[in-house]
Amino acid sequence: MSGIQPVPGAKPLSMWQQYGPSEKTVRGIVIGGITGGIEICITFPTEYVKTQLQLDERSATPKFRGPIDCVKQTVNGHGFFGLYRGLSVLLYGSIPKSSFRFGTFEYLKSQAADERGNLSPVMRLLCGLGAGLSEAVFAVTPMETVKVKFIHDQGLAQPKYKGFVHGVGCIVKAEGLGGIYKGVTATMAKQGSNQAIRFFVMETLKDWYRGGDNTQPISKPIVGLMGAVAGAASVYGNTPIDVVKTRMQGLEAKKYKNTLDCAMQIWKKEGFFAFYKGTVPRLSRVCLDVGITFMIYDSIIEFLDVYWKKQQ
């Protein structure tokens, strides 16, 4: 329930106004979805390289010598757009993921903010955590599982997936619906910690920059810089979780009993630094990703605020 109460003598509130989500929550859902679609089209190549490196397990003859070599081999073998293989799968997931993330955060923030619209440090962390868990369960886990399997499949000599629908059908047929929820525990841990760190850092930097005055504007380059800092903090905070999640969602996930077993096998067979495999491409991707995401999100909100005020 939105908590909106009718004013005596005023026009009766509709069912949507009384029981539906608040305006900020709806804006978070819609604008978040638009933001997610734009952002993933810009940053996908680094996501592709990161995933390829994490799936390239240590062996006597590793396929890639690093991120640059991965890019070279991909472009030489498939052309420039080879770096965009699997984009459609991630695009299908990025829009709902971003919608759940920002919609949930805006809802939780509206419930936890003080009279000036600011969050306490603990609430920043908890609202970010809630946003991450929401996107993990409802969007990230199924779509990331499909994405990782697609990218892994495209690296094989004879790919078996002919397209998004065919690929999902093959996965469900072979593994059941549970096949697209492989690694859900690791994904919840990853997304929860990711967004807890990012929103905490972002809201803290914004509050510091504004001096506690929530009405003060922040230029878009500064928002982008804050987003990059928040992204970098999340990378160093949870890359090990990301590595385990990727292994659990790959085509060879069946060799692991569960998330803990996957982590133990990586530790025993590959050592501590295997948990930070793919950090360089992930760092560049995430800093760019988070910076762009918050810039786009804030820009669309400002644009719509001006438009809506003109309509009133």
Curated annotation (Swiss-Prot):
Q: Where are the Solcar repeats?
A: 23-111, 122-208, 218-303
Per its UniProt record, what PROSITE patterns does this chain match? Answer: SOLCAR
Q: Which GO terms describe its molecular function?
A: citrate secondary active transmembrane transporter activity
Q: Which Pfam families match?
A: Mito_carr
Where does this protein reside within or beyond the cell? Mitochondrion inner membrane
Cellular component terms (Gene Ontology): mitochondrial inner membrane; mitochondrion
Keywords associated with the record: Membrane, Mitochondrion, Mitochondrion inner membrane, Repeat, Transit peptide, Transmembrane, Transmembrane helix, Transport
Q: How does it sit in the membrane?
A: Multi-pass membrane protein
**Residue ranges crossing the lipid bilayer per the database entry:** 29-49, 75-95, 126-146, 164-184, 221-241, 286-306
Cite a single GO BP annotation. Answer: mitochondrial citrate transmembrane transport
Q: Respond yes or no to whether keyword Cytoplasm is given for this record.
A: no
Family of this protein = Belongs to the mitochondrial carrier (TC 2.A.29) family.
The UniProt function text for this chain reads:
Transport of citrate across inner mitochondrial membrane.
Q: What is this protein called?
A: Putative tricarboxylate transport protein, mitochondrial
Q: What is the lineage of its organism?
A: Eukaryota, Metazoa, Ecdysozoa, Nematoda, Chromadorea
